[in-house]
Amino acid sequence: MTRRAPALDREGAFLLAEGNREMSNAKSKTKNTTGWKTRTKLVHEGIRRSQYGEVSEALFLTQGFVYDTAEAAEERFVSLGEDEFIYARYGNPTTRMFEDRMASLEGYEDAFACASGMAAVNGALMALLKAGDHVVSSRALFGSCLYILEEVLGRFGVEITLVDGTDLDAWRAAIRPDTALVFLESISNPTLEVIDLKAVCNLAHAVGAKVVVDNAMCTPIFSYAAEAGADLSVYSTTKHVDGQGRCLGGMICGSRDLIRGPIEAYLKHTGGAMSPFHAWVQLKSMETLDLRVRQQATTALAVADALDGHPALNAVRYPTHKAHPQYDLAKSQAEAGGTVLTIDVKGGKEACFKFLNALDIFTISNNFADAKSIVTHPATTTHQRLPQEQKDTLGITPGMVRVSLGLEDPDDLIADLRTALDAL
């Protein structure tokens, strides 16, 4: 009997040689996920089983795929089926399961997995833009996002206009009839500004511009990008999806036309695709994503409440905490404000460093959304390359600390923070 390399069946099973079909059908069946709640989708969505009927999703750690004949190889390259594969840079069964699960969680038709969050941001922007285009973006962005906008896109003749993302009038004034794309962070990193996403989407779509949202701080659990009308929702899955500081990843979610059109074409040819191993690690992490993120968000609000008014602090900021200047907007858009808060330590950099060095449980690092609680000094790390004037405009002060809450007991975290602050 001629053997054929397996291809994926959209109904949930790998297509096998004719003699093995009965076993495949017995071990994998079509699942109607309509109406399933988030936690159920995070465990079951996108699963495709091979003829072996494995319970845990399989890791296809392979660069390429086998064809029975030269004619079969030619046919595959001429007309690649939706779930057929030719090379891991173009697609992989494990990666496809991860993409399907993320798209379902986000409420989009499709998704493309990338090597990192910044590969996802770069891929989304480069795939949709050309020389001479105009982009409007919020000015409060992660340092690497600012670099891509100002240095990379600027070098290729794309005009960039940065605005105060919290000011709808500023968006209205900046978006022009020839604006091609709007880019923003739904919750800015690290300043935690909140943008009226639906209003900005309406302004952009009125002139035919695409909207790309970096949703890393919002988290996939509390995301409202699809509901608000964003064309693409971009993630660093390194953060909450992996959630344990193990491996890099990124994801672009959107319509099938955008994802399997310009996005896939750009990324598969420029090498931004995700490793199958990283896809497998993060696919498995999604099973506990809702449980982890909700606990971290609950802890973040508890910490904000506990530190609010501490004499060593100028401010505590968390989107759904009553002291946040955009509290009402944040509460109207999302169930919670994410897993990160910021504090502003009195006494500037010197006092801030003393505070950081006095912490016992918190880890000093530049990542966030880990199971371990992490503290970061943005002015000297993630945003150190920005001119001081730009830091001042954004509100990145010498005393700002980004506090990422992990899965430790909230009482222990609060005690650790208070002890370090009380010593100042």
Regions found by a protein language model. Name each.
Residues 2-15:
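Positively charged N-terminal leader segments that act as targeting/secretion signals
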Residues 21-29, 150-151, 159-161, 173, ...:
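PLP-dependent enzyme catalytic core of the Aspartate aminotransferase-like
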Residues 24-92, 100:
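N-terminal "arm"/small-domain region of PLP-dependent enzymes with the aminotransferase-like
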Residues 32, 42-51, 111-311, 317:
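Conserved PLP-enzyme active-site core in the AAT-like
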Residues 64-65, 254-258, 286, 345-350:
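Short loop segments at secondary-structure junctions
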Residues 69-119, 144-151:
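Conserved N-terminal alpha-helix of the aminotransferase class I/II PLP-enzyme fold
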Residues 105, 307-311, 359:
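Acidic-histidine catalytic/liganding microenvironments
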Residues 315-401, 405:
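Conserved C-terminal alpha-helix-loop-beta "cap" of PLP-dependent enzymes
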